[in-house]
A protein has these predicted regions:
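Two-component/phosphorelay signaling modules centered on CheY-like receiver
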Residues: 13-16, 31-49
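Active-site residues of response regulator receiver
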Residues: 72
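The feature encodes the CheY-like receiver
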Residues: 76
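Conserved acidic carboxylate
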Residues: 28
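Short hydrophobic/Thr-rich beta-strand motif most characteristic of the beta2 strand and flanking loop
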Residues: 45-52, 60, 124
Length: 167
């Protein structure tokens, strides 16, 4: 059986600091995308809950606490913007990573809406760049502990990867 080519990112944690698993909600109606995101997050040591629809996402957000939500913009029963609206009403304080096949203009509109309701988000296009997702999750874990985001992938700073996918 071939070995996985995935190796965890170095922690860059100060001595004595412990990594904390993020509570992640994956909202995507595409089973393959949900699986990819779930596997990457679990490999990084995070706890994952999935919601394949707007209705399930809203229900899970009402009944559990999440550090981060990955969110597709187009779902069978509605729009990811609807989920962002519900998150704003609930004063969601976690991170949001939009992962969508929609064009940059639509992802930018989602980011603008999110900012207008007090939510900051990152945006990654489909097909998903797993390295960028892993970096984003690693940095979220660090910032949740009050540490600066420091991870890079292949010598490229995280901010450069995320900025490349903005707009």
């Amino acid at each position: 059986m071939p070995r996985s080519s995935f190796s965890p990112l170095p922690s860059n944690l100060p001595d004595g600091a412990e990594r904390r698993a993020l509570q992640l909600l994956v909202v995507d109606d595409d089973a393959t995308q949900r699986s990819l995101i779930t596997v990457a997050a679990k490999q990084a040591g995070h706890e994952v809950t999935v919601a394949p629809s707007v209705a399930e996402a809203i229900e899970k957000l009402r009944t559990a606490r999440f550090d981060c939500v990955t969110l597709d913009l187009v779902l069978e029963d509605g729009d990811g913007i609807d989920v962002l609206g519900e998150m704003a009403k609930a004063k969601f304080g976690g991170a949001v990573i939009v992962i969508s096949g929609m064009d940059g203009k639509r992802r930018s509109a989602a980011r603008s809406f999110a900012r207008s309701v007090g939510i900051e988000l990152q945006s990654l296009p489909k097909p998903l760049d797993l390295a960028a997702l892993r970096i984003s999750l690693a940095n979220l874990g660090k910032t949740a502990m009050g540490l600066p985001a420091m991870h890079t992938w292949g010598g490229v700073a995280t901010d450069a990867i995320v900025e490349r996918h903005r707009a």
